[in-house]
Amino acid sequence: MNKFGKYFIFLGIILVIFSFSLLIYNNLKDYQAGKSSKEVLKIIEEDDKQINENIITNVNNLTNKEEKVININNNNYIGTIEIPSLNLKLPIMSDFTYDKLNISPCRYFGSIETKDLVICGHAYRTHFKYLANLEQGDLVIITDFYNNTYIYEVLEIEILKPTDIEEMLSGEFDLTLYTCTSDSKNRITVRCNLISE
């Protein structure tokens, strides 16, 4: 075997190892995100004492309205999101950072009250990976910490570029959910309107 053949075999082995390592890393991050969300949900759903000790009233900087926020592990949550057709229930963080997305979906913009809530989440299996499987008419349920339940209906699903921030935030939709496509080049965007509160 010549020098180039050995070089390409070595390069191929390195690429296989790198790909396998990346797969393990991504699956580990997905697992950790799912575990973190489940722990927070358990506290929210089962531990009333801890919740009552951690409830604070926060003024939403986007709306200047008061909202009930629960602080768990130094992160503020505004409620939960449930998508029955995906068998998914997750806590919602009150604000967005990339680090917080590793724990749960985050409010990116707006509020329930102003009917312009935008929630983003990673495309982890345990978070928003399957948003593209939603269909028109599917339900999305958000519950806040005043125990108000808001039921939304999926109206449309669209694909936006990551730079289409203005389009993401515009429109006459009461709720928008979004996550990355599997290749991370675009955003799966689910538009919903409130049908019951």
Locations of regions flagged by a protein language model:
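Short, Lys/Arg-rich N-terminal segment immediately upstream of the first membrane anchor
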Residues: 1-5
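Solvent-exposed, non-transmembrane regions of membrane-associated and secreted proteins
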Residues: 6-197
